[in-house]
Amino acid sequence: MARIAGVDLPRNKRIEIALTYIYGIGLSRSKEILKKTNIDADIRCQNLNDQQIVSIREILESSYQIEGDLKRFESMSIKRLMEISTYRGRRHRLGLPLRGQRTRTNARTRRGGKKTVAGKKKAPRK
C-alpha cells in the first residue's frame, strides 16, 4: 500500500483516482501530477514501483499545498476574516451562510437543527 502525504492510498484503484484521496487533490490536479511524472493514469496503485512513488511524493512536496498545510491555511484565512471583522468574517462567527443565501427560511445546514418555539395556546372553549 502506497503512503503519500500521510494518506494510505487504496491498493486496487487506478492511481489517477487514488491520488484524489489526498485532501487538496482532485481529479484534474491528479492528472496534472501524473503528466509531470510521466506515469500512466491507468496503472493500479499496487503496481507502482518505489521510484514512481518517490517521484509523486517529491512533486507534491515541492509544488502543492496539501493535507494539514492546506487545512491550516484555510482556517487561518477564516480566522483573519473574523479578526478584521469583514462581512464574511461576521457571518462565519454567527454560523450563517456567507454568500447571500436567504436565511428567513432554509439555511438549516449552516444554522443547525430546527429549534422549536412555543406558539400561542388556544383559549379553551366555554
Curated annotation (Swiss-Prot):
Composition skew (Basic residues), residue ranges: 101-126
Family: Belongs to the universal ribosomal protein uS13 family.
GO biological process: translation
Gene: rps13
Molecular function as annotated in GO: rRNA binding; structural constituent of ribosome
Record protein name field: Small ribosomal subunit protein uS13c
SUPFAM superfamilies with a match to the protein in the record: S13-like H2TH domain (SSF46946)
Domain of life: Eukaryota
Region of interest (Disordered), ranges: 97-126
Pfam family, one: Ribosomal_S13
Assembly description: Part of the 30S ribosomal subunit.
Subcellular location per the Swiss-Prot or TrEMBL entry: Plastid, Chloroplast
Keywords: Chloroplast, Plastid, Ribonucleoprotein, Ribosomal protein, RNA-binding, rRNA-binding
Keyword RNA-binding: yes
Record's GO cellular component terms: chloroplast; cytosol; small ribosomal subunit
Functional summary from the UniProt entry: Located at the top of the head of the 30S subunit, it contacts several helices of the 16S rRNA.
Keyword Plastid appears in the UniProt entry: yes
Signal sequence residues: none
